[in-house]
Amino acid sequence: MAKKKRKKYDPTHLIAAIEKWALPFYDKKHCYYIYVEGRARSNQTRIEHIVEHGHDLKVRDLDLIPEGINHYFEYKKDSTYKNTYNYYINRGGKDKGFIKVSIRISDKDSKRAWIKTIFITYKIK
């Protein structure tokens, strides 16, 4: 029996959804850029995406992100893939300079579900 080739993880839809749902909550005038990084479980591929805004981010501007920001989004992929992506955006941790995004990817065909974590980091220049 031939071993089934694992499909390479494509982060395009994930990045698009983060841009659509997460970024509008933050004042773009105060961001230098936003760095989105993640790791695909299957092949440990790094996902990197830089959104350029052309403005310096000062330390004080991090206060513009509301304390305890807590947004939950659900993004359903095309029904043929039978996948559901949940986006949970939270300003947390001691380091107020990043927003953690946890994505739960569950497949209706299998009983297994796994978590992918992505950091949206506000770079301070």
Question: Which residues fall in each region the model found?
Answer:
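Ribonuclease/tRNase effector modules and their secretory precursors
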Residues: M1-K125
